[in-house]
Amino acid sequence: LKNPSEYERLININKSPSNQIEMCLGSIQEMEEDGLEKYLDKFSKEDRIAYIHFRNVKGKIPNYVETFVDDGDINMVNVIKILKKNNYQGIIIPDHTPSLSCDAPWHAGMAYTVGYIKGLIKSE
């Protein structure tokens, strides 16, 4: 899929409640067409999200980079506000967490991301 609107087409092919999407925030943000928050709102309101990959990026394909969750183009505060507004009850998965320079680089990056997500959820 190259644009977020194509997800809508995919959902409309089969109206079964089992037809849900993996909502990768970074993948949708880096697509040519903007609209991450619009589609996040729509799909979470309609209970069409199986789970969310919570990651951030800067730029668009082919010139994008993965960033720390609090340092990209996506406003993660707005993401959590939208999910809360629509009573999203699904899974949020930290995804593509950058490593830190320490003895446990992946674990430290994951801990940072999980702490950030928990902080957003509790603050909003």
Give the positions of each predicted feature.
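Histidine-acidic metal/acid-base catalytic patches
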Residues: 1-124
